Amino acid sequence: MASQGTKRSYEQMETGGERQNATEIRSSVGRMVGGIGRFYIQMCTEFKLSDYEGRLIQNSITIERMVLSAFDERRNKYLEEHPSAGKDPKKTGGPIYRRRDGKWIRELILCDKEEIRRIWRQANNGEDATAGLTHLMIWHSNLNDATYQRTRALVRTGMDPRMCSLMQGSTLPRRSGAAGAAVKGVGTMVMELIRMIKRGINDRNFWRGENGRRTRIAYERMCNILKGKFQTAAQRAMMDQVRESRNPGNAEIEDLIFLARSALILRGSVAHKSCLPACVYGLAVASGYDFEKEGYSLVGIDPFRLLQNSQVFSLIRPNENSAHKSQLVWMACHSAAFEDLRVSSFIRGTKVVPRGKLSTRGVQIASNENMETMDSTTLELRSRYWAIRTRSGGNTNQQRASAGQISVQPTFSVQRNLPFERATIMAAFTGNTEGRTSDMRTEIIRMMESARPEDVSFQGRGVFELSDEKATNPIVPSFDMSNEGSYFFGDNAEEYDN
């Protein structure tokens, strides 16, 4: 991309930093994950968790959610202004699972938010360390992406449920900053904008007055974030139109849905980073690893290395498959929910199966589930190879793709053909090319029609042996293009409900 020079790397977004050189980036990212690790160790001490309990992913998630809730300024302010029965606005908590007499028991804990903020700051050299908080949000978002389908949300905004490969980061809170914006898919941004426009259609005061001015600024900023994800001039020009609209309405919604569809072939660039559960960083810190000194990258070999050497456990329900539970968490750790399964399988070294074939529900356990029958299992999060995470959508190319998901959003920078179902996608583009965006629409459709099979993405990029930390010997895998590559193919994954 031509504008590469003006962009901050993810890591700079991630750590809120200005331009830094590679070593500075590695050490500031190291400082961030080291802080998460120190915080986790301290929380385990507070709750008197055994080593085994501290490695339980469900306990990790509870602790992560508590610190996110403790720092959620807007929600905390809202809770104080609108007291609701039985909710103490100054406290946060969740389920902690403990091993007692050969059984798992659930204990609900409550903690002062102030106390959690103190522990978090203490673990992060007295700073608020918002980058670390965002990192945890992205890990939760990646876990949601791998676990749930967003069919209902897509349909509600007038989009096609088969566009699920564009929905990365759809459950990220708005406060997740630049690092959060970087990992949001095209569909996620489109959905946020459509929701906003719909509110404006239904509420005449939405764009008016002092509040309306702020709303307008937010609208234009979201438009610019989405524009930055597109790689072709016509798509960007169309985003300018949407942004500059005096009174956004149905025409803009149409344009946005058109753009989302076009992204199935003319892919946007969406960042991918491996964000691991807090307990993994905690384990490494506890074993004496100095993240800041050694440096760390979210997009290189480091997360793979960390997972090779970490033992994480998970609660498992009676009829769930332990290997499937591991796959779900592995995909979440590498933000690979929308990656081609053939690529994921090759890197992981074991077959990665579509969501519909997994015998496992989500990682989190609902409060009404029976603990008597719960068991625990070791998650297998190791990999055979590693690959660099990408921030580009790659060029595109035609292959057979599936009924459920008709495109992929690459996670790993690996040379391959990118599957998509041209006939299915193009069928959506009949009709409307009139109106003020007609020339751009025509141009976009022309580009989609001429996307050629030989345009492989990521020329020459490959996977690497885990011993090859400098990425010197790429192995370019060959994929069997005749079988299925989509994760949400013909799927029955649960819906995500807030």
Curated annotation (Swiss-Prot):
Point out the gene that encodes the protein.
NP
Concerning InterPro entries, the annotation shows:
Flu_NP
Q: Mind telling me what this protein is named? A: Nucleoprotein
The function of this protein is: Encapsidates the negative strand viral RNA, protecting it from nucleases. The encapsidated genomic RNA is termed the ribonucleoprotein (RNP) and serves as template for transcription and replication. The RNP needs to be localized in the host nucleus to start an infectious cycle, but is too large to diffuse through the nuclear pore complex. NP comprises at least 2 nuclear localization signals that are responsible for the active RNP import into the nucleus through cellular importin alpha/beta pathway.
Q: Where is this motif: Bipartite nuclear localization signal?
A: 198-216
**Principal subcellular localization:** virion
Q: State the similarity comment.
A: Belongs to the influenza viruses nucleoprotein family.
Modified after translation how? Late in virus-infected cells, may be cleaved from a 56-kDa protein to a 53-kDa protein by a cellular caspase. This cleavage might be a marker for the onset of apoptosis in infected cells or have a specific function in virus host interaction.
Q: Which is an annotated GO molecular function term of this record?
A: RNA binding
| Location of region: Disordered | 1-22
Keywords in UniProt for this one? Capsid protein, Helical capsid protein, Host nucleus, Host-virus interaction, Ribonucleoprotein, RNA-binding, Viral nucleoprotein, Viral penetration into host nucleus, Virion, Virus entry into host cell
> Which organism was this protein described from?
Influenza A virus (strain A/Grey teal/Australia/2/1979 H4N4)
Q: What is an annotated GO biological process for this record, any one? A: symbiont entry into host cell
According to the record's subunit comment, the protein's assembly and interactions are: Homomultimerizes to form the nucleocapsid. May bind host exportin-1/XPO1. Binds to viral genomic RNA. Protein-RNA contacts are mediated by a combination of electrostatic interactions between positively charged residues and the phosphate backbone and planar interactions between aromatic side chains and bases.
Q: Which residues form a coiled coil?
A: none
Task: Provide the taxonomic classification.
Answer: Viruses, Riboviria, Orthornavirae, Negarnaviricota, Polyploviricotina
A single GO cellular-component term on record: ribonucleoprotein complex
Q: Where is this motif: Unconventional nuclear localization signal?
A: 1-18
**Subcellular localization(s) per the UniProt record:** Virion; Host nucleus
Pfam families per record: Flu_NP (PF00506)
